[in-house]
Amino acid sequence: MATMQFDLVSPERRLASMEVTEVQIPGADGDLTAMPDHSPMITTLRPGVLKVSGAEGEKSYFVTGGFADIAGPSATILAERAMPVEEVTGEIVEELIKASEEQKSAASDGAADAAAKYHADLTMTLDAIVGR
């Protein structure tokens, strides 16, 4: 089966660099799956779970947002914040939700809808991960 290079980086660290058969991406305009020889594209990410499949099995990462750069032989994810889903703890959930609530309440009229959508996406994803 054909593979593509996958890289996931955040400001804190490089989380993954491996050959994969597909990457499921939580895009801001909807989820998408990138596979080898995918048409080139750049998209923004929403809070969600990014899943990769390859010879090592399936791995899942929580991302808060960022960008995905997909170009035929590779997919590079530049995440604002990312971690393996196994590392998401109750403390991290509370920290992220509190920050999102503060951002939502401080948003100007023009940014209120975007802040509310971000908060809803973040809360839904974190609830699914920790089973709240």
UniProtKB/Swiss-Prot annotation:
Name a single GO cellular component: proton-transporting ATP synthase complex
Q: Where in or outside the cell?
A: Cell inner membrane
State the annotated membrane topology for this chain.
Answer: Peripheral membrane protein
Check the UniProt entry and state the signal peptide residues, or none.
none
Q: What is its main location?
A: membrane
Task: Report if keyword RNA-binding is assigned.
Answer: no
Which UniProt keywords are present, listed alphabetically?
ATP synthesis, Cell inner membrane, Cell membrane, CF(1), Hydrogen ion transport, Ion transport, Membrane, Transport
Q: How does it assemble?
A: F-type ATPases have 2 components, CF(1) - the catalytic core - and CF(0) - the membrane proton channel. CF(1) has five subunits: alpha(3), beta(3), gamma(1), delta(1), epsilon(1). CF(0) has three main subunits: a, b and c.
Q: Which HAMAP family match?
A: ATP_synth_epsil_bac
Main function: Produces ATP from ADP in the presence of a proton gradient across the membrane.
- Protein family: Belongs to the ATPase epsilon chain family.
The name this protein goes by in its record: ATP synthase epsilon chain
Naturally occurring in which organism (per UniProt): Jannaschia sp. (strain CCS1)
Report which gene this protein is encoded by: atpC
